[in-house]
A protein has these predicted regions:
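Amphipathic, well-packed alpha-helical segments that form the structural scaffold of globular domains
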Residues: 61, 65, 84-92
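A short glycine-/small-residue-rich loop at the edge of a beta-strand within enzyme catalytic domains
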Residues: 47, 51, 70-74, 78, ...
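Cyclic-nucleotide recognition modules
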Residues: 4-69
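N-terminal positioning helix adjacent to the helix-turn-helix/winged-helix DNA-binding module
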Residues: 75, 79-82, 86, 123
């Protein structure tokens, strides 16, 4: 049985500087372009370039926020809310990336702040591992979100979200608008 504890997307950082070994395995589920840094030159770069150190700290804090969000998702949400939350997380991440730079080959389209589309990075089977659900439940819940007009699908992986606020409502994220807060930074 596979237990996925995180999902990295373009621009994410893998591993921790200064550690010889990671306490986990990282597996790519899609094609990746990876940039590797040698430990000592990277440490020197961070010391010499404070804004890179600051950005690395911000990325670490973002990862901590994501882990907290993930604990909430796994512990308190229904299957439908888990699927909607997963889609909202992916949408939020791709939208934030698209704001910062043109995304080549990622299949992301942001026509308006409320409507967006993207390619899912995971298969239904990988989503089931990631969300702690059966593959049948993942498929049923995606079909239900599609039937209810929350999302549209082209093929198995291309998702369009006609109304982001509706997806966030389905995710049960009523405490704060995490998408708009994150995308505004």
């Amino acid at each position: 049985r596979t237990q996925m504890v995180g999902l990295l997307l373009p621009s994410d950082f893998i591993g921790r500087p200064g550690r010889k070994f990671a306490p986990f395995t990282v597996s790519a589920v899609t094609d990746v372009r990876l940039c590797c840094f040698r430990s000592r030159p990277f440490a020197n770069l961070i010391e010499a370039t404070p804004h890179i150190a600051q950005r690395l700290l911000e990325m670490t804090l973002d990862e901590l926020d994501a882990a907290r969000e993930w604990m909430l998702l796994l512990g308190r949400k229904t299957a439908r809310e888990k699927i909607a939350s997963f889609l909202a997380i992916i949408a939020r991440r791709y939208a934030a990336l698209a704001e910062g730079a043109e995304i080549g080959g990622m299949g992301v389209h942001l026509p308006t702040p409320q409507k967006l589309s993207f390619d899912l990075p995971l298969t239904r089977e990988s989503m089931s591992d990631y969300l702690g659900l059966t593959i049948e439940t993942v498929s049923r819940q995606i079909s239900a979100l599609k039937r209810d007009g929350v999302i549209t699908l082209e093929g198995n992986r291309h998702v369009s979200v006609p109304n982001l606020d509706r997806l966030l409502a389905e995710a049960g994220d009523d405490s704060e608008d995490v998408f708009h807060d994150s995308a505004a930074e």
